[in-house]
Every structure is written in structure tokens, then in C-alpha cells.
């Protein structure tokens, strides 16, 4: 699980709504600092503590923490993001990680292969859903995302908010993709 925080400034209220007499008495409304929190998923991909996740999970954040499967909370550092492919690398600031997910080859996939989505939807840790590969090379532009360059694997494994950044794995336990988006609403 990946938790993020960023400092944002919010105006207390719209100054145009303040009566001019009250404004003279109280002064101009100030700006309040606030912490915005986010959550997503990720997967450790080597024994040096590199975590692969989505760029939209960790972009423009001040703090990143990674909760491991055993409940250990580690400080993370964003090493890089690519908003075009929606991928990011986070380095866990700890030592050795003997357990990490092997990377598979998505080019070996066929429609009908098993697809297993892991993540923390709605903050529910260690969630696993099962489905199949429904389509390969799905064009994201057809979904209205013209700013991305993704070659999508479509699956019917349940993906929900918070699954973003979590691994999509094959029946051999190899990472074949990173859960990125959910299509919902009419026609989904």
C-alpha cells in the first residue's frame, strides 16, 4: 500500500462574500495550509526496494510511505515519474528485500489467460481479484485519454479506486502489468 501527502493552501472562504464592514473590522481572509492525502498500490520489483506504481499515485506529493505485506511502514522516495505511460518508481529507504515480484513478459499473453489483480482498493489491504485477459493492445485514446501512450491489457478482474499502481500478475506470479484505470458508467 502506498500512502501520500502533499501540502496545499486553501483560502478560508471567498472574500467577495464578506461584507465590506466586516472586512474592515476583521481584515482579509487568510490562506490556510492543509494536508491532502492519497492512497494507491505498488509492487516491489527487486531486492533493493524499488517499488513500481502509477505516476498519478505519487506525482506532486511531499511525502510517500509504503506499507509492506507484514505491516511494516517504510519511508519512500519518488525516484521518477512518467506521466505519458503513467508509471513511477519509488525507493523504499530500508535495506534488503528478499521477497519481490518477478517481472513477466506481457508480449507472451493471450486473450483468455488468467489475470490476477492485487492492491488496496478503498484502503482494504491485501485484496486479490481474479479474471482473464479480455483484450490486448487496447487503445487508451478510444477511452478519451489523449495525453497518455499506453498499450493496455484489458481484464475483467475487479479493479477499484486504490488498486492504481498495483500489479496485474499471471498464473505464474509474474507481473504482467500495472493496474491503471477503471472504465465505469454507461457502456462500461
Predicted segment positions?
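Serine-dependent protease modules
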Residues: 1-188
Amino acid at each position: 500500500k502506498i500512502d501520500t501527502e502533499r501540502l496545499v493552501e486553501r483560502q478560508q472562504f471567498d472574500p467577495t462574500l464578506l461584507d465590506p464592514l466586516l472586512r474592515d473590522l476583521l481584515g482579509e481572509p487568510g490562506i490556510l495550509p492543509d494536508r491532502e492525502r492519497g492512497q494507491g498500490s505498488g509492487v516491489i520489483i527487486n531486492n533493493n526496494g524499488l517499488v513500481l506504481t502509477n505516476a498519478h499515485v505519487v506525482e506532486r506529493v511531499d511525502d510517500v510511505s509504503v506499507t509492506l505485506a507484514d505491516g511494516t511502514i517504510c519511508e519512500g522516495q519518488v525516484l521518477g515519474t512518467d506521466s505519458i505511460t503513467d508509471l513511477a518508481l519509488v525507493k523504499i529507504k530500508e535495506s534488503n528485500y528478499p521477497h519481490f515480484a518477478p517481472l513477466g513478459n506481457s508480449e507472451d499473453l493471450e486473450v483468455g489467460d488468467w489475470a490476477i489483480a492485487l492492491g488496496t482498493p478503498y484502503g482494504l489491504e491485501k485484496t486479490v481479484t481474479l479474471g482473464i485477459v479480455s483484450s490486448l493492445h487496447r487503445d487508451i485514446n478510444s477511452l478519451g485519454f489523449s495525453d497518455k501512450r499506453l498499450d493496455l491489457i484489458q481484464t475483467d478482474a475487479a479493479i477499484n479506486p486504490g488498486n492504481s499502481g498495483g500489479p496485474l500478475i499471471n498464473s505464474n506470479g509474474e507481473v504482467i502489468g500495472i493496474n491503471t484505470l477503471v472504465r465505469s458508467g454507461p457502456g462500461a
